A protein has these predicted regions:
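Non-catalytic cap/lid and distal C-terminal segments of serine-dependent acyl enzymes
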Residues: 1-274
Length: 274
């Protein structure tokens, strides 16, 4: 896997930003003629499918690749991975930082302009954990036509992004759930999902997962049921032995990558030996 740490000037955020991009590349077995037809090239046969992978609170663009084997999983399955640093801004507009615009418009513009990855919705996916799960739902339901599928792991479906950005972590209880439901519909996963339904648009396919020892398990189950009631195609996974933790997310990101409803040529070729 070719791994790039990119630092560039964002025209949305008006400052330099860091992202990590991993791109499938020639493997050691391929370079030694142990797999494939013996020929090697750094020119892809087609543009790679891409997964925009969002981190959780307190993390950054390097956390997913540091705490999981996502590089290995992506290399085996030949899919590009894009990680960014969204601070604790929940991937929405807070103050002068418009991370919603950055993620939805500028990040794909930069990545697709600089790397051999697809712009086609058929080959574009988004996923995230905790705060990143919240961001995934907001972006996927704001622009459902842009993503084939989404993955939300231990998603903070009732997060208050403004309080989070100020260092205030609100209790995820029934009272707070009602408060979230009445918030600005532009940043409420619940309201955005209802809007997709009301406008008659198809939902991206949904992969939803949460550990049963996680304090937000019940809110995840409730949101899963809400999506099903709205007509979304939801795949659900849970594990009795895990809470809000990286060992669970490492398991889930591999399951998610295997689950993706891919139609690209690389998927048809099957998993590679690394």
């Amino acid at each position: 896997m070719a791994k790039f740490t990119c630092n560039f000037i964002s025209y949305t955020l008006k400052r330099t930003v860091d992202i990590t991009v991993v791109i499938p590349s020639v493997t050691i077995p391929e370079s030694m003629g142990m797999t494939g037809d013996g020929s090697c090239t750094h020119t892809p046969t087609e543009k790679y499918p891409v997964l925009y992978l969002l981190h959780g609170m307190g993390n950054n663009h390097a956390t997913w690749t540091g705490y999981t084997n996502v590089e290995l999983y992506a290399e085996e399955r030949q899919i590009a991975i894009v990680n960014l640093s969204a601070e604790n801004k929940s991937y929405v507009k807070i103050g002068g930082d418009d991370f919603f615009q950055f993620v939805s418009e500028e990040l794909p513009d930069f990545v697709c302009g600089m790397f051999p990855v697809s712009r086609e919705p058929e080959h574009t996916y988004i996923a995230g954990l905790s705060m990143g799960g919240y961001g995934t739902l907001v972006h996927a339901f704001s622009h459902p036509q842009r993503f084939k599928a989404l993955g939300a792991f231990s998603a903070a479906v009732s997060i208050n992004p403004y309080e989070l950005a100020m260092g205030k972590i609100a209790k995820l209880d029934e009272e707070f759930q009602k408060k979230m439901d009445s918030q600005d519909p532009a940043i409420s996963p619940q309201a955005l999902a209802q809007k997709v339904k009301a406008e008659g648009k198809p939902f991206p396919k949904v992969y939803f997962a949460c550990g049963k020892k996680d304090g937000i398990f019940d809110t995840n189950v409730a949101f899963r049921d809400k999506l099903v009631s709205l007509g979304a195609d939801v795949t659900w996974d849970e594990h009795p032995d895990y809470g809000h933790e990286w060992r669970f997310w490492d398991l889930e990101i591999e399951k998610f990558l295997d689950w993706l409803p891919r139609t690209d040529g690389y998927a048809k070729a099957g998993k590679r030996q690394i």
